[in-house]
Amino acid sequence: MRFRCLVMDHDDTTVNSTATIHFPSFLAYLKLVRPEASYTLEDYFRKNFDPGIMALFTGELGFSEEELEGEFRFWQDWVRTRVPSAYPGICEILRRHKDAGGYIAVVSHSMRESIERDYRENDLPEPDIIFRSEEHTSE
């Protein structure tokens, strides 16, 4: 085996989470705090990358500190109760790598509990280590 460790992102690499979990959560929260606002999935993807989600929230949408905290709690609750599907073929890729003696590392902004649950619920091989990229530490 040439590369023993396969380093995976989680959202939208291993599981289809933005379209099925994060964007619907965003729309549901907007309905509560900015009912006049309207975004498509494409808008949401684009603005996540430029200017970034926080700039969207604080700039374009003008969220207050209270609304930012509310959005984060709302999103966490939403994510806890919904499991995104793994992309077709990803299980086979990960299993083949593990069966050959390789390691799987996940680097993500997602919560550790969500990553572990998503792997378990999609019957994916358990990652050997999970790094939360925003904290720059492993959990």
Model feature map: region roles:
Residues 47-48, 87-90, 127, 133-134:
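Surface-exposed loop/turn and secondary-structure junction residues enriched for glycine/proline
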Residues 2-88, 100, 113-116:
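N-terminal helical cap/lid subdomain that shapes the substrate entry/recognition surface
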Residues 91-99:
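Surface-exposed amphipathic alpha-helices with a cationic face
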Residues 111-138:
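Substrate-recognition "cap/lid" segment bordering the active-site pocket of phosphatases
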Residues 28-29, 96, 121-122:
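Alpha-helical structural signal in soluble globular domains
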Residues 105-106:
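Structural beta-sheet core signal
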Residues 3, 94, 126-127:
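Core-facing hydrophobic residues within beta-strands of well-ordered domains
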Residues 99-101, 124-125:
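Short, well-ordered coil/turn elements that cap or connect secondary structure elements
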